[in-house]
Amino acid sequence: MSKGTSIKEALSKWEEKNSEKAAEAKEVKLYQMLPPIEKMDASLSTLTVCEKLSLSTNCIEKIANLNGLKNLKILSLGRNNIKNLNGLEAVGDSLEELWISYNSIEKLKGIHVLKKLKVLLMSNNQVKDWGEFNKLQELPVLMELVFVGNPLEEKHSAEGDWQDRVTKSLKALKKLDGTPIIKNDEEEED
């Protein structure tokens, strides 16, 4: 099997293509690298100015080496092989959006560090139970959630009580699976 592209190589390609230093860029796109990126290595820490980092459509298994990305607001990791959310601590104080659809995440342990997270795009993962889902209650400003395609959502959508159960659990939520949440006045008063 061929060796994957390193972050350092990907950043070099990006700089060549964009005629800009990655370390000075607010948005860095390292998606769909050929061969794919397999590891989030220490070279990421050079992206101190970066506000939006895209690493989607690669073969990354673990979230790592985000220390140094003090300004990161949007992290895109969709379509990888990520199994858990460990490794987000370094961006806990800045990250506002996490795009992590089409991975293999079953457990939401580690998400609680994202105190500024407003948007979580997490469709097509493997979350199966409410115990895991309810860890999202630890995100005080979460307003938009996409969770379609997880076993938990599929089961409860089929039973017809998905939106109801989610809005009872996540009271600040404004949008679920692309649909605005309309609350009636009685719910607003609790």
UniProtKB/Swiss-Prot annotation:
Q: Name one GO biological process term.
A: outer dynein arm assembly
Q: Where is the LRRCT domain?
A: 150-190
- GO cellular-component terms in the record? cell projection; cytoplasm; dynein complex; microtubule
**Covalent S-S links between cysteines:** none
Identify the InterPro entries for this entry: Leu-rich_rpt, Leu-rich_rpt_4, LRR_dom_sf
> Repeat LRR: residue ranges?
49-70, 71-92, 94-115, 116-137
Drop me one GO molecular function for this one. Answer: dynein heavy chain binding
Domain of life, source organism: Eukaryota
Hey, what's the signal peptide range on this chain?
Answer: none
What the entry lists under Gene3D superfamilies is as follows:
Ribonuclease Inhibitor
Entry keywords, A to Z: Cell projection, Cytoplasm, Cytoskeleton, Dynein, Leucine-rich repeat, Microtubule, Motor protein, Repeat
The protein's location, in the record's own words, is: Cytoplasm, Cytoskeleton, Cilium axoneme
- Subunit description: Interacts with DNAH5, a outer arm dynein heavy chain. Interacts with tubulin located within the A-tubule of the outer doublets in a ATP-independent manner.
Q: Which family does it belong to?
A: Belongs to the dynein light chain LC1-type family.
What's the miscellaneous note?
Answer: Outer (ODAs) and inner (IDAs) dynein arms contain the molecular motors that generate the force to move cilia by ATP-dependent reactions. There are two mechanosensory systems that monitor and respond to the mechanical state (curvature) of the axoneme. One system involves the central pair microtubule complex and radial spokes and the second system involves the outer dynein arms.
What is this protein for, i.e. what is its function? Part of the multisubunit axonemal ATPase complexes that generate the force for cilia motility and govern beat frequency. Component of the outer arm dynein (ODA). May be involved in a mechanosensory feedback mechanism controlling ODA activity based on external conformational cues by tethering the outer arm dynein heavy chain (DNAH5) to the microtubule within the axoneme.
What is this protein called in UniProt? Dynein axonemal light chain 1
Q: Which organism is it from?
A: Ciona intestinalis (Transparent sea squirt)
